[in-house]
Amino acid sequence: AFTELAARCDAVAVVGLSMGGSLAVWLAEHRPEVAALAVVNPLVTPPDTATTGFIEAMIEGGDEIAPGIGSDIALEGSVESAYPELPLRAALSLFEGVEEVEAKLDSVTCPVLLFTSTQDHVVDPKSSNVLMERVKGPVEQVVLERSYHVATLDYDKDEIEARTVEFLSGVLTAARP
């Protein structure tokens, strides 16, 4: 899809939340023509070995699923459309992929707009610190004090939308020939 879009457009930016942010970063690592990234609470560092070991032990014990992790949202009444269960083998596969993402962060050279929730119960905010330290392109971080992980449905959703539009408009306008 990126290849088709890049063939038709002067510049392409990629936006993602959580695992979508991980995938956006991965794409920028592998496709240097990505003009910009805007990511919200991306997972770019795998969890510690205790966490992965616990999941592996659950699988070895016969468990294939765990309760879902959706709707980490501070705003009362806001609900994320998420799976009610978490497939454990898929989680381990995600963590393996994130190891690759972390290893190649220094290959990201495009401008990055990074939104980080300080009270994220899904992705450790330290993941954002690693991204800021390792990417080679300029990073603008927006700290979200009131929103949890799914910040695009939380208190700061309007700020995320406005800042993303402003950032991408500037970067993509500058990227036009």
Explain the meaning of each model-derived region.
Residues A38-D48:
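Active-site nucleophile loop of the alpha/beta-hydrolase fold
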Residues C110, D124-E133:
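Short alpha-helix in the alpha/beta-hydrolase fold that links the catalytic acid
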Residues R146-P177:
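Catalytic active-site module of serine/aspartate enzymes centered on a nucleophile-bearing elbow/loop
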Residues S107-V108, L114-T116, D120:
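Short beta-strand/loop motif that positions the catalytic acidic residue
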Residues A6-L17:
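Alpha/beta-hydrolase fold nucleophile elbow
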Residues G16-G20, A24:
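Gly/Ala-rich beta-loop-alpha elbow adjacent to hydrolase catalytic centers
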Residues P87-K104, C110:
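Active-site nucleophile elbow and catalytic-triad environment of alpha/beta-hydrolase enzymes
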Residues N129, E133-V150:
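Catalytic histidine neighborhood in serine/cysteine hydrolases
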